[in-house]
Amino acid sequence: MKLSEYNEQISKALDYFEKANIVLTDEEKQNVEVADFGKGMVNDIGLQLVVYVNTERVCAKEMVLLPYQTCPEHKHIPSNNASGKEETFRCRYGEVYLYVEGEKNVAEIKAKIPASDITVFHEVVLKPGE
């Protein structure tokens, strides 16, 4: 990803943190990350995040999914004597569309998922507070 695109994603994420009334320190604003999960399609598959804590057992993050971005289902499996991690999502602003294993449960999914190796289409919709 080009540096200009990376910086644009960060700028958009900071706008959404502000809209959602999530207060970040100056240091946290400087440390916003952009993840494209190795797909190179950050506008479709990716997210922006601030990491508060990241240890072998615990991770605390605030994430922004921009309109039409989706976070692919993934796992943090045990490795190198680490027991792995579980993740959970809580929507603070807007709507979040997650796609997980299971029977396809809607006629047409809400996300714009590009042709890729994504194989799960069971849609979970999160609204603020969920």
Model regions and ranges:
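Residue-level recognition of conserved beta-strand positions in structured domain cores
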Residues: 62, 75, 100-102
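Generic detector of intrinsically disordered, low-complexity, polar/charged segments
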Residues: 35-37, 43, 65, 91, ...
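Short acidic-glycine-tyrosine-enriched beta hairpin
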Residues: 88-90, 102-130
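Sequence-level detector for tyrosine residue identity
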Residues: 6, 16, 52, 68, ...
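Tight coil/turn sites that cap or link beta-strands
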Residues: 66-70, 128-130
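A short beta-loop-beta micro-motif enriched in histidine and acidic residues
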Residues: 48-60, 74-91, 119-120
